[in-house]
Amino acid sequence: MSKIIAIVNQKGGVGKTTTCVNLAAAVKAKGKRVLLCDFDPQANATSGMGVDKSVSNGVYDVLINGTETAKAIISTPYGDVLPSSKALAGAGVEMIEMENRQFLLKAALRQVVEQYDFIFIDCPPSLELLTLNALCAANSLLVPVQGEYYALEGLSDLMNTVRIVRRSMNPSLDIEGVLLTMFDGRTNLSIQVAQEVKRFFGTKVYSTVIPRNVRLSEAPSHVRPITAYDRNCRGADAYIALAEEFLKRNA
C-alpha cells in the first residue's frame, strides 16, 4: 500500500527540507521504493538529492503544462525525484483559474503512486495554494518543529489549516508524526518546547530527535543527503534512526 507524506510547517528554517531529503534517502537505503516530490519553488530538496535545479521538466510542467508525471521524474541513488524549479513560484497564481485547483498535485501523483512505497512532499514555508495542494494529496503530515519559543505558535496555525482541510477536502488526512529538529538537550528552551509538543501531540512525537549538527548544514552544498556525505556523523545517525522509527510505525 502506497503512502503519501507531506512534510510541512509554514514556519521557515525548521529543518523541513533537510528532513525530507534525509528521511527519503534513509528510507530508500532500507530497501523501500521512494519518490521525493519537491513542491517548494526554492528547489533545495531537488539539489539536495543531487538533481540540477535547471532541469527541463519538473512538477511545474506537470501541474501547469500537462506533462506526464512519469516523464518528469528523475532517478538518483537516493531515491526518485519529481523536481522543482523557480517557475513553481508563479504556479499559485496560474492555478487560481484552473478547475479543481486544490487537487492538481493529487491528480499528478495518482499517475505514479502505485510505483512507490512512500512519496515524500517537501512543502513551501507558507499556507497558500501550493501547500493546500500538498495537504489534499497527502495521506498524512510529518511536522518538523524547531526547539524555540515561536515554534508552538506556528503549530497552532498549521493545525487550524489541517482542520479546515479535513472538514471539506481531505477528511482522512492524518498526523504521521512530529519531529523535534535542531534539538539541544543542554538548553532549558529545547526541553520546554519538547515537553509542550509532547503534551499537545502525545505519541505522535517521534522519540528520535534531530540534533544541531554542522555536517547536516554542510551536506546540501555537496548536493547529497547526509548519509552519503558523512555516514558517521550525529546527523546521519539521527536520520537513520528516524527512518527505522518511521518504518516501524508503518509496518
Protein language model regions, located:
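P-loop NTP-binding core
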Residues: 1-251
